[in-house]
């Protein structure tokens, strides 16, 4: 569940509502490519803009059409009660794992974030992935907090932000995390432009926005990493440098991937 390529698709919109037909077209690309898992309703999946009913519907569609590929569903919300309700919806839909970001309006402190994860893992019957995405949550996990949360019995993985641009520094960062996190907790890199560094450094998987639209090239990277072919990992990432440059130019991946999906005819042009 928490290794290889976890592809994070868009939740496309049309006329202000989720475009189910377009969502299924995106899913078909991922199932055809046989990605290792699906990360649905993450930041790329616009979870924060959807109602509970809309999220439940997208969750049901994802699991129904995943063709036995495990689905991880994001349950991020501002209130703990809402998070628990979303967790229940996700599990009823058939989620294999839950992706939990520490979402808040007021800035959260570390004890509050720990309590959130403690509460969710106590109620959940599937493993939880720690979603460390300071770009959207505006909360930064300290290593000490990651270690506290990772020690909870229900935690299965941590989705880390991009690793350092220098490979030696990325190696050091992964070694530091490996030295403190439980062996049972996998480490998945995000921040697509630095995914190659993370995979070469030893991340178990890639939580990938790029993989949600271009799954075959992303899977080629994770498979090369698993085989120890670091030269191929680097070459595949170098091919995508124009895409990484667009991510930097436009303040992240979301707008770029949305535009690309429209240009490919998979979604409305302004999805």
State the predicted function of each range.
Residues 199-202, 241-271:
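Conserved short secondary-structure transition element at the edge of the structured enzyme core
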Residues 7, 223, 258-262:
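Generic alpha-helical structural context detector
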Residues 1-140, 146:
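Active-site beta->alpha loop and helix N-cap motifs at the rims of alpha/beta catalytic domains
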Residues 122, 134-241, 247-248:
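Catalytic alpha/beta core domains of metabolic enzymes, predominantly
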Residues 23, 55, 59, 83, ...:
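A general structural signal for well-ordered alpha-helical segments in protein cores
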């Amino acid at each position: 569940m928490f290794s290889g390529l976890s592809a994070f698709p868009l939740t496309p919109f049309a006329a202000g509502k989720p475009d189910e037909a377009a969502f299924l077209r995106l899913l078909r690309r991922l199932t055809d490519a046989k990605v290792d898992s699906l990360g649905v309703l993450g930041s790329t999946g616009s979870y924060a803009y959807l109602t509970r009913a809309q999220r439940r519907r997208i969750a049901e569609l994802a699991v129904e059409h995943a063709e036995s590929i495990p689905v991880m569903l994001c349950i991020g919300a501002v209130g703990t009660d809402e998070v628990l309700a979303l967790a229940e919806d996700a599990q009823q839909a058939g989620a294999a794992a839950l992706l939990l970001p520490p979402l808040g309006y007021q800035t959260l402190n570390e004890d509050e974030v720990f309590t959130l994860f403690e509460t969710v893992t106590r109620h959940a019957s599937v493993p939880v992935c720690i979603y460390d995405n300071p770009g959207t949550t505006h909360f930064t996990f300290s290593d000490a907090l990651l270690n506290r949360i990772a020690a909870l019995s229900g935690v299965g993985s941590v989705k880390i932000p991009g690793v350092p641009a220098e490979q030696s520094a990325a190696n050091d960062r992964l070694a530091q995390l490996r030295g403190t996190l439980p062996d049972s907790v996998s480490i998945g890199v995000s921040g697509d432009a630095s995914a190659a560094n993370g995979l070469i450094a030893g991340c178990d998987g890639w939580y990938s926005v790029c993989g949600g639209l271009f799954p075959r090239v992303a899977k080629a990277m994770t498979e090369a990493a698993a085989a120890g072919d670091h030269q191929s990992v680097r070459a595949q990432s170098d091919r995508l440098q124009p895409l990484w440059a667009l991510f930097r130019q436009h303040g992240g991946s979301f707008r770029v991937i949305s535009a690309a999906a429209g240009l490919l005819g998979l979604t409305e042009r302004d999805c």
